[in-house]
C-alpha cells in the first residue's frame, strides 16, 4: 500500500469515527472541527518568597491543594507569618529541586504599600528599558516564575505548575545563579553528547533541575537592613550527576513539556495589564 493510499484510508477512518461519535451523542459533526479549538489561560496556584531567617519558598495550603501536591499530611505543613502579620499554613521549602517552565522578563512596578494610593502595584515597564526610572523607595523590580518541584528521585511533587513572584534581592540572586547553572548544563550536555556547545531555548532548559539551598541574608544600609531570600548554593552538573539534573528520558520530559505547552502563557495573568503605566 502506498503512502498516499494510507493517508486516504486514515482520513476515511477518522471521518467514520467522527460520524459514529456524533450519532451516538446526537450532535452535529461540524461541531467537532478544530476551528473551535482555542487555548485558555488557566489561573495558576501561587507561592510566596519568604524573606526571613530561615528563608525559602512558601506555598499556602490552599494553593498546594490547587497544585495537586501529593504529600499533604499535617506533619508536612509549616505555619509561616506573612509580611502583613497574617499566619498561614503550607509547604515551606528552604531547599528545592525545581524546573522552570518559563518566566517574565524583569519589570519595574510600584510597591504595594498603602501610602502609594492608586499607584500601588502599577507597572512602570520592563527593567531593561526603564531601569533609569527606578526609585527604590517607592518601586521594586519583579519577575514571575512558573515552577514544578521534584523529589530526589525526580518525581513531580505536584500536578499543576506554581507561579511565584521574585522581587529585588531574591530576584537578582536567582537570576545570577540560574545564568551560571544553565550555562554549565549546556556545556556539560555538549561534552556528553559530543556536540558543539550552544545556548538552549526555554523548552530545553525546562528539563534542567535546579537544585538549590536558600538562606536568609541581611541586606540594606544602616537601620534599614532586613532579611532577604538568597540562593546560598546550588548543584553544578558533572558527568556523574548529570542524569539526576536533566530529564532527558522521554517518559520524564513528556510530562514537563505538556505542562510547558499548557501553562507558560498563563504567566501574563500575574501582570495587572489594566493598571500598566508605560513610561518612555
What residues fall within each predicted segment?
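Polar/charged alpha-helical tracts
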Residues: 23, 30, 176, 180-191, ...
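Accessory, usually C-terminal, subdomains that scaffold auxiliary metal cofactors
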Residues: 200-204, 213-278
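OB-fold ssDNA-binding interfaces and closely related basic DNA-contact patches used
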Residues: 2-161, 222-225, 238, 279-280
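Extended serine/threonine-enriched, polar tracts that run as long, contiguous segments within proteins
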Residues: 143-237
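Amphipathic alpha-helical interaction segments
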Residues: 77-78, 180, 265
Amino acid at each position: 500500500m502506498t503512502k498516499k493510499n494510507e493517508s486516504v484510508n486514515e482520513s476515511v477512518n477518522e471521518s467514520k469515527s467522527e460520524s459514529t461519535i456524533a450519532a451516538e451523542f446526537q450532535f452535529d459533526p461540524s461541531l467537532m472541527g478544530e476551528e473551535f479549538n482555542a487555548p485558555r489561560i488557566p489561573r495558576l496556584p501561587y507561592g510566596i518568597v519568604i524573606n526571613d531567617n530561615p528563608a525559602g519558598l512558601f506555598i499556602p495550603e490552599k494553593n498546594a491543594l490547587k497544585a495537586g501536591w501529593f504529600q499533604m499530611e499535617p506533619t508536612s505543613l509549616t505555619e509561616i507569618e506573612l509580611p502583613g502579620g497574617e499566619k498561614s499554613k503550607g509547604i515551606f521549602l528552604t531547599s528545592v529541586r525545581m524546573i522552570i517552565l518559563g518566566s517574565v522578563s524583569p519589570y519595574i512596578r510600584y510597591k504595594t504599600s498603602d501610602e502609594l494610593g492608586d499607584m500601588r502595584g502599577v507597572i512602570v515597564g520592563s527593567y531593561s528599558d526603564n531601569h533609569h526610572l527606578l526609585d527604590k523607595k517607592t518601586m521594586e523590580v519583579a519577575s514571575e516564575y512558573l515552577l514544578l518541584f521534584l523529589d530526589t528521585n525526580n518525581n513531580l511533587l505536584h500536578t499543576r505548575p506554581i507561579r511565584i513572584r521574585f522581587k529585588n534581592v531574591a530576584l537578582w540572586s536567582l537570576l545570577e545563579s540560574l545564568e551560571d547553572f544553565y550555562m554549565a548544563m549546556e556545556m556539560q550536555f555538549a561534552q556528553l553528547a559530543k556536540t558543539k556547545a550552544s545556548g538552549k531555548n526555554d523548552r530545553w532548559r525546562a528539563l534542567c533541575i535546579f537544585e538549590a539551598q536558600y538562606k536568609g541574608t541581611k541586606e540594606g544600609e544602616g537601620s534599614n537592613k532586613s532579611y532577604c531570600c538568597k540562593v546560598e548554593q546550588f548543584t553544578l552538573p558533572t558527568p556523574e550527576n548529570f542524569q539526576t539534573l536533566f530529564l532527558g528520558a522521554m517518559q520524564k520530559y513528556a510530562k514537563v513539556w505538556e505542562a510547558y505547552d499548557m501553562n507558560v502563557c498563563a504567566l501574563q495573568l500575574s501582570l495587572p495589564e489594566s493598571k500598566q503605566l508605560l513610561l518612555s
